[in-house]
Amino acid sequence: MDVFDKVYSDDNNSYDQKTVSQRIEALFLNNLGKVVTRQQIIRAATDPKTGKQPENWHQRLSELRTDKGYTILSWRDMKVLAPQEYIMPHATRRPKAAKRVLPTKETWEQVLDRANYSCEWQEDGQHCGLVEGDIDPIGGGTVKLTPDHMTPHSIDPATDVNDPKMWQALCGRHQVMKKNYWDSNNGKINVIGILQSVNEKQKNDALEFLLNYYGLKR
């Protein structure tokens, strides 16, 4: 697709599916191959009864990729897409991993106590530390902590539900980020997902590494 092939959706419909995720899913399935904007997603995600706009629509969008296996592309994937533009090129879904398990209530309380009721995500020596009920300064919306397998679910879906050492507390944004780091089909690092998530300089650094590795020049 080049910039002249971009076809924008003119979908201004409201959607009445039960959940935010289902409403966003319906929007994309009704507009396959068309560019959908942030405002269209928010409109579709809005509760049809109360008119309330969801804070966490972006997380539900990411879950359509990671949990349901849809291909939804953004500017990180295609240069012709501007920020806040998305496209679902087809409705084919990748296979899902085995059903997830959750820690027991007692185990989860121990995890939260260890974490001081804050997100335990660590990256480049930086600790997230967002507390339940905070407003996420990057992703927006109210922080809700949920349990995450220390070992990726795709590698060991039968994590011990009674062992707090096997679990960590993550905010919604970092739950999605971790899912993007791992390929649920084979339990290996999702290199493409990581490259999509990094900034332009890091993409160029990766390109330079590969060019040097293969003895090529720009």
UniProtKB/Swiss-Prot annotation:
Entry EC number(s): 3.1.21.4
GO terms of biological process kind: DNA restriction-modification system
Enzyme class: hydrolase
Reaction equations catalysed: Endonucleolytic cleavage of DNA to give specific double-stranded fragments with terminal 5'-phosphates
The entry's keywords: Endonuclease, Hydrolase, Nuclease, Restriction system
Gene Ontology molecular functions: type II site-specific deoxyribonuclease activity
Acyltransferase as UniProt keyword: no
Name of the protein in its database record: Type II restriction enzyme KpnI
Lineage: Bacteria, Pseudomonadati, Pseudomonadota, Gammaproteobacteria, Enterobacterales
